[in-house]
């Protein structure tokens, strides 16, 4: 008699799970092969987020055994749908080491690896989760954006994200994820780096669902409690989206220095900079030269350039959550030191200054620039180095990261620096022709000169080697447009019109002459 209930239970389980289990059982071996090849190095053989590379990553890789996922269309605390998992695998997670796999793996491989990932957690054996209905965004306007800002303040979003949305709120230095690892509040001015998407709808969905495993909560309960309305939460999403450019910034290889007939800007806040185009330069962690750095705080710098025919001015701006050194960020530094001690030795126990380096080929017209990480002893780079404490800029020769010799003699550079609402703005100015052309490049109009950038956040444990770097780009000084460029088209139009009028009049005279000589037609 005892065997009959067991048989019935087995039959019931087979009826309930049979079709789904058969699909999963078929997919899992194929998914395991994909996972072992492409995923286990970070996420670990058993999906616990403990792969051999995990110590080099912050945030740490996802622990699939916990069943906790940030990017979902489901309610807070629920599992993601298969579509949610597929989205993250396809697109990756900006700001983390997780890349998108759309171009690397086939559709079938991605579906197979989803089935295998789900096998790591017992929570996926239940009913499939369902996405919440978020409706559609209401129309926007200046008044709607202003209302969004008001609700942003009401919900105290500024405590983490800051008054201006730079991720520099008073709580920002204390933020940790569910695994007690330090985690940055998002910079709301860089929507192209938002996890889960950058549209108003994507942002609203994150507000409704939260980012499980992080300090970012769901605000669905605030709506349910009638503290705010659903429309007001949409307004917050619209306000947040308004802080970023409409389109992700295009990365261009050439920075054009605008030629001005007026005086060069007096500093980074000078309104004259409105006439110079801003170029976005992405930065990545310096992971080539030891000590390497896998957790940079700065991911991009905006560069503007202007010259007046005798001097060149560069304006550089980047988000920085602190003006280092800042005692409010001592707790953050302690957590970063604990999290990253396995990577090429410990960080400094106290904060250093914020740093900026702009490097050039030492001579104009070189076909190949030096090594992009500060040059080398064989081929040095010319470098401008700025520090926040003390606020100073120096030009000199670099023979590698952290290997810098300042120029002797009178200073060649002038500068002005400004820290405003979580953003550094630095202007550096120099004569086009340096005092010593054997050690520093001349800036020649109508000729591109290689240029590269390095930024370090002292509050994040960064220094002259541990920081964020760019590839080589080029700065090109515009030339005055010759008068003939403006005059020649006008003259051509006048000559063409005059010639056309002359031909018409000649044709009319011939026609009248023909009529007189042949009056009967």
Give the role of each language-model region:
Residues 15-23:
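C-terminal segment of classical bacterial N-terminal signal peptides
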Residues 301-304, 413-419:
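Beta-strand-rich interaction surfaces with strong enrichment in secreted/lumenal proteins
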Residues 56-102, 107-118, 174-241, 336-338, ...:
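Extracytoplasmic electron-transfer domains, predominantly the class I c-type cytochrome c fold
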Residues 311-318, 424-432:
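Short, well-ordered beta-strand segments enriched in hydrophobic/aromatic residues
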Residues 31-46, 113, 117, 148, ...:
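The canonical Cys-X-X-Cys-His
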Residues 23-34, 124-153, 247:
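Electrostatic cytochrome c docking/interface patches
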Residues 249-274, 330-388, 435-519:
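Acidic/polar low-complexity flexible segments
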Residues 415-422, 440-444:
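Exposed beta-sheet edge/beta-hairpin loop segments within beta-rich domains
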